[in-house]
Amino acid sequence: MTAPAAVVWDITYACPLRCEHCYSEAGRRPSRQLSWPDLARVVDALVELSPRTVVLSGGEPLVVPEVFRVAERLRSGGVSVHLYTAGWHLPDRTVAAVVEAMSNVTVSIDGASAATHDRLRGRAGSFDRAMDAAARLTDAAAGQPELAVGVDYTVTRSNFDEIPDFCRLVDTRFPSLDYVFFGAAMPIGLASRKGFVTHEMVTSRQLELLRDESYADTLRTHLRADLVVSDNEMFQMRPERLVQGEIPAMQVEPDGRVRAMPVYEGTVGSLLDEPGTTLWQRAMARWDDPRVTSLLEHARTMEAWADATRRLDLMFGDADDQRRIERRPAFP
């Protein structure tokens, strides 16, 4: 495969929230945001790869002043743009700009109640703001088929039982919502901490239900939007799944550096210095590294996956990554 079909660009590590399961540790590390000239260079390098989609994530992409220029430049290059937002600050002008510039927008909401969501997302008031953002975005996008608006719910042990109530809630509040995605929290980033795995990672029974199509069918009776439920295991990148064709997106850090593997620390170079195709080939070579395959091929439980994550992050992360990992706060 000479180029990725999709790219995830964490365009900033700045974030108003402090999510307990954040894979990028946004808000706990320098933002590494680029100025417009270098943002434009990264955009042009991505367009050269001809992916179907670029996902703008973070951090909170909407804190980047040039995010809409980025989206417009990508779309003018024939690439669809998918924005992820926590919805913390969306004045009317921002809602209008999102509707104008994006192909798809997803609001992250992790519970059917403020108590649950705010605890997991690390800031009081974040549930109400996210719900308001989803309402205003769905209203603004109504009648505009070129923009899809959805909600992403990261499933943890403590919010699992709220899933049916959440389906009913969003169906009532957002009648024109396009989709809802329920994905298991993965033991990556902050969620790879031993305490988080012990207390908040989904149980084996909860994981079984997320994999059970009849469970998803039951949830579909509560809402009109399209619904997807996933164990997110494809992101683990076990060798046999790569062989089966589960090729991940290219993961780009805020300053243009490309990760070898999307959910693990470790980069292979920068789009500001080398062609994207060169970096993609270098990334794919990492997937077959015996040190990687030996850790991932036996990671069949969340606990084992978390252990593999911690080892890979320390193995391939740079000195700054290693220092940040050592300073991670204990959970709970």
Show which residues each predicted segment covers.
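Short, functionally important structural connectors and interaction interfaces within domains
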Residues: 7, 26, 54, 82, ...
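Intrinsically disordered, low-complexity peptide-like regions
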Residues: 8, 108, 316-319
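Flexible mid-to-C-terminal extensions adjoining Fe-S/redox cofactors in radical SAM and related proteins
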Residues: 1, 257-332
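Charged, solvent-exposed alpha-helical segments that act as regulatory interaction surfaces
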Residues: 28, 143, 289-292
